């Protein structure tokens, strides 16, 4: 480090570690077809003030370490002058609000997107009686119900973040849908966030298949 270079306000070693963790998991999700056309964004808590997050507009199946950047919890770039996802505030609001949350994943699978369109009018998808509800932290039985919120899509992330915050004031949840867009899911770490994401995907698939079999909603 020369005399004109300010020290980084976060651990470069920790960022290196998280970049590789994110890239490995994101690549698997990309290969599953959940991140088409450079869509989706992913992050991991770096420390008490920063998160590592994917740079905007990058092919998620071909990420390299330079495609992971650092933002503070106001969503501002730290260290390198890169552009984070437009939806960065939807990640950082969770880290700011819940110190225990360590990872946020946002994907655009066909199932997630179709479900978000079908249930946009009601604003919620009710999942009930499924054994896989036990995949969500805090659930110990299939004899329970979970309501997955569906928010209207908007390009104003301040508005959407405020709507999410207002709902979090009333209920606990591990994810939500955005109409015509995709799914946000999170957890205490990457493993838990992946478990929640995959459980949502499976359960939404089941609900859509039931709709086809019943012929009505």
Curated annotation (Swiss-Prot):
Provide the catalytic activity annotation.
5-(methylsulfanyl)-D-ribulose 1-phosphate = 5-methylsulfanyl-2,3-dioxopentyl phosphate + H2O
Which Pfam families does the annotation name? Aldolase_II
An annotated GO cellular component:
cytoplasm
User: Which EC numbers does the record give?
Assistant: 4.2.1.109
The GO biological-process annotations, alphabetized, read as:
L-methionine salvage from methylthioadenosine; monosaccharide metabolic process
GO MF: methylthioribulose 1-phosphate dehydratase activity; zinc ion binding
Q: Which SUPFAM superfamilies does the record match to this protein? A: AraD/HMP-PK domain-like (SSF53639)
* UniProt keyword terms in alphabetical order: Amino-acid biosynthesis, Lyase, Metal-binding, Methionine biosynthesis, Zinc
Q: In which pathway does it act?
A: Amino-acid biosynthesis; L-methionine biosynthesis via salvage pathway; L-methionine from S-methyl-5-thio-alpha-D-ribose 1-phosphate: step 2/6
Entry similarity comment = Belongs to the aldolase class II family. MtnB subfamily.
Read off the HAMAP family from this record: Salvage_MtnB (MF_01677)
Q: What is this protein called?
A: Methylthioribulose-1-phosphate dehydratase
Q: Which organism is it from?
A: Xanthomonas axonopodis pv. citri (strain 306)
The gene name reads mtnB
